[in-house]
Amino acid sequence: MSLFDHTVSELHTLLQKKEVSISDLVDESYRRIGEVEEKVQAFLTLNEEQARAKAKELDDKLAKGEETNPLFGLPIGIKDNIVTKGLRTTCASKILYNFDPIYDATVMERLNAAGAITIGKLNMDEFAMGSSTENSGFQLTRNPWDLERVPGGSSGGSAAAVAAGEVPFSLGSDTGGSIRQPAAFCGVVGLKPTYGRVSRFGLVAFASSLDQIGPITRTVEDNAYLLQVIAGVDPMDSTSANIDVPNYVEALTGDIKGLKIAVPKEYLGEGVAEEVRQSVLAALSVLEKLGATWEEVSLPHSKYALATYYLLASSEASANLARFDGVRYGYRTDNAKNLIDMYKQTRSEGFGSEVKRRIMLGTFALSSGYYDAYYKKAQKVRTLIKRDFENVFEQYDVIIGPTTPTPAFKIGEKTSDPLTMYMNDILTIPVNLAGVPAISVPCGFVDGLPVGLQIIGKHFDESTVYRVAHAFEQATDYHKQKPVL
């Protein structure tokens, strides 16, 4: 049995009882990485020397009885678009291959203050643009359940590392499903918090009105512990909300009697695999037995979500990624004839094809002749999508459906057709456009591949999302299943 088969609270108890040391936990993480990393390839950069030194320092503190934080001394993996002082941050892009940040993201400051130990930086789709982690500029991460399949994206490394037992938990980011979709594919728990619940300061921006940092874990309780530490207002992020952070772990009562669940007909219709649909219906039966009720509803504008998202996200990306020009940091071409040529050559050589595709799409949507027809109209449709959610939440506590239309697909299966790849996020994207919280929890298997159940909540009501997810988890054993590597 691995140490990481224990939950956060169990590991905390083991540390308090001196049955294991923090150094033991860090050793276990690097031992497991040495054992499976060649197959999974979740990590881009390891932080071994600093992690072992910090473990020794924290063991000394623990011996004096100084620390009681549940995350104290626990190893964590960090998606490589979250800046880490003194630890290379690449966004899985060649244009940032040598970027060494001089500051920590706010979430890193909070994790460090809580005593978590960064094991390394995790692979992703370049600049978080992708649904399979095949767009990484450096390596291909594989799904621990089937090494011929993708782990999802863009936080594929974050989900694969947790599923493979390399770390007990990790941080990812979610712009259109990039935490929930890989969590579903890898059979782990992933939460996209409400927009503004977690500071984005130090998250390398893709689409600033959509991005959110969130936790990926083995259990719902672990997820709640991690969100507890990273959530809260931040003066460095004007979009972070000054709303009190409740005790998420206390919300895990197991009691969902009288809970009203909405199930959008659009989320179980065309394009959703029958086996996935059956897994979700079986999950709803479990929740019914626990005292909840569910009814079918409609989110009528969700059919426009994909087009709306790709116009808005690409437009924001084209502006955000303008800063990568070879002048201040990162890759710079050696072939430039003049300054303008340096900009062109650096960006052409440094960005991958998917990033360039989205920059071009966004630039086109923002151009003067097309702004009203595309960008402005997409913003109006986004408002309608948000209203759909608000209308449903007037009568229901949560919305439930599948996280993804299918289980994990094979490596290379969708790379030649961007639209087919984009369709994979069709059930997660509306949540980002509405800004509401949502979690993916394991709810079954299809041919040995995990299926994810998506539970969507009201703005800043992560507590109810967690309560429902935890009740379902405790009534089933899907979260206890592990891949064999």
Swiss-Prot record:
It holds the Pfam family Amidase. GO terms for biological process: translation. It catalyses: L-glutamyl-tRNA(Gln) + L-glutamine + ATP + H2O = L-glutaminyl-tRNA(Gln) + L-glutamate + ADP + phosphate + H(+). Its EC number is 6.3.5.7. The active site is at K79 (charge relay system), S154 (charge relay system), S178 (acyl-ester intermediate). Keywords: ATP-binding, Ligase, Nucleotide-binding, Protein biosynthesis. One of its GO terms (molecular function) is glutaminyl-tRNA synthase (glutamine-hydrolyzing) activity. Signal peptide: none annotated. It comes from the Bacteria. One of its GO terms (cellular component) is glutamyl-tRNA(Gln) amidotransferase complex. It is an enzyme of class 6 (ligase). The keyword ATP-binding applies. NCBIfam families: gatA (TIGR00132). HAMAP family: GatA (MF_00120). Belongs to the amidase family. GatA subfamily. Heterotrimer of A, B and C subunits. Allows the formation of correctly charged Gln-tRNA(Gln) through the transamidation of misacylated Glu-tRNA(Gln) in organisms which lack glutaminyl-tRNA synthetase. The reaction takes place in the presence of glutamine and ATP through an activated gamma-phospho-Glu-tRNA(Gln). PANTHER family: GLUTAMYL-TRNA(GLN) AMIDOTRANSFERASE SUBUNIT A (PTHR11895:SF151), TRANSAMIDASE (PTHR11895). This is Glutamyl-tRNA(Gln) amidotransferase subunit A. It comes from Geobacillus thermodenitrificans (strain NG80-2). The lineage of its organism: Bacteria, Bacillati, Bacillota, Bacilli, Bacillales. The gene is gatA.
